[in-house]
């Protein structure tokens, strides 16, 4: 089942979410916006099973990676920007 995955620019490039994902949905791509010069990307969202292990692994104060299940959206989660 596919789920919407959003990577926020608070990503510090630590790779914790990539290593936590049991279905290899996430990968790191080059990005100049952080010290690590890489950011998480979700090119294979169709493989996401919604376990949210990536969220649990994220060490930032505000989760840099979010998985929205079914009808959840940033608005329904109270995270609208």
Curated annotation (Swiss-Prot):
Q: How does it sit in the membrane?
A: Peripheral membrane protein
Membrane-traversing stretches: none
Q: What does this protein do?
A: Apoprotein for the two 4Fe-4S centers FA and FB of photosystem I (PSI); essential for photochemical activity. FB is the terminal electron acceptor of PSI, donating electrons to ferredoxin. The C-terminus interacts with PsaA/B/D and helps assemble the protein into the PSI complex. Required for binding of PsaD and PsaE to PSI. PSI is a plastocyanin-ferredoxin oxidoreductase, converting photonic excitation into a charge separation, which transfers an electron from the donor P700 chlorophyll pair to the spectroscopically characterized acceptors A0, A1, FX, FA and FB in turn.
Q: In this entry, which stretches build a coiled coil? A: none
Residues annotated as binding [4Fe-4S] cluster 1: 11, 14, 17, 58
Q: How does it assemble?
A: The eukaryotic PSI reaction center is composed of at least 11 subunits.
What are the residue boundaries of the 4Fe-4S ferredoxin-type domain, all occurrences included? Answer: 2-31, 39-68
Its protein name is Photosystem I iron-sulfur center
Q: A GO BP term, please?
A: photosynthetic electron transport in photosystem I
Lineage of the organism? Eukaryota, Viridiplantae, Streptophyta, Charophyceae, Charales
Molecular function GO labels: 4 iron, 4 sulfur cluster binding; electron transfer activity; metal ion binding; oxidoreductase activity
């Amino acid at each position: 089942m596919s789920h919407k995955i959003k990577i926020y620019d608070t990503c510090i490039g630590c790779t914790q979410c990539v290593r936590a994902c049991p279905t290899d949905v996430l990968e790191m791509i080059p990005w100049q916006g952080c010290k690590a010069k890489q950011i998480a990307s979700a090119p294979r969202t169709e493989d996401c099973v919604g376990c949210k292990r990536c969220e649990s692994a994220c060490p930032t104060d505000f989760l840099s990676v979010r998985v929205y299940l079914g009808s959840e959206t940033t608005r329904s989660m109270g995270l609208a920007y």
